[in-house]
Amino acid sequence: TTLEPFDHPYNTTALNERAVELAMVHGFVLAREHDLYPTPAAEAGVLGRCLEVGNVLSHYEDYIVLPPRRVVDRFEVAPGVENIDVFDIKGTYDTIISISTIEHVGVDDGRGYPGAALDAIFHLRSLLAPGGRFFCTFPTGWNSALDHSLNWGEISRLAVTEVYVARNGEDWGEYGANGRRGFYPRPYGLTQPWAEAVWIGEFGPL
């Protein structure tokens, strides 16, 4: 199927992977609110104890209404953002969101070990409360360990739900949920400066 992309003036969103990541996270937020607080009287934008890893959503809060949350980003300096390493995050959370951040762990942080991204996924899952959900996206072609895990189905075995999304000309096509159906990791920036394919999924607690 073809996804309806999200458009926003920040960072030429409609041209890159944010177009699909933000459309998907918006759907996740709405579904998560209903899961946690299904009554009509529930306050909108409530995701329980919420953590965002990678300061992304603050740039789009005029579109996606989110509750107060802890935001951790190792490198981006901004008001309300804690500059600490992902492995130093502690606490217990009902909802964790990370958009195109996990692929940088082990690659762009001086570690020189791409497999640290998979370790980070396990660490964040360990912070989930019972019934918690970790919504995660990452582009292919950036972190070799994540690409390898996609090729061998390791990520699929860990995820509760997953969707593979790839460019189809000027559009983005969905290559299936919980089933690859022709998806494969594509090199980052093959035809333009951004991602060619994105993995989007949810993890439960360990």
What residue spans do the PLM features occupy?
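Class I SAM-dependent methyltransferase Rossmann-like catalytic core
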Residues: 1-44
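Short, flexible/disordered intra-domain loops and linkers
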Residues: 9-14, 106-118, 145-149
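Conserved SAM-binding loop of SAM-dependent methyltransferases across substrates and taxa
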Residues: 27, 55-67
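Adenosine-cofactor binding site in Rossmann-like domains, unifying the SAM/SAH pocket
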Residues: 62-98, 115-120
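A conserved beta-strand element that flanks and buttresses the S-adenosyl-L-methionine
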Residues: 97-102, 106
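A short glycine-rich, Lys/Arg-flanked "PGG" loop and its adjoining helix->strand segment in the class I
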Residues: 112-133
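Short strand-turn motif at the edge of the Rossmann-like AdoMet-binding core
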Residues: 137-141
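Class I S-adenosyl-L-methionine
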Residues: 149-206
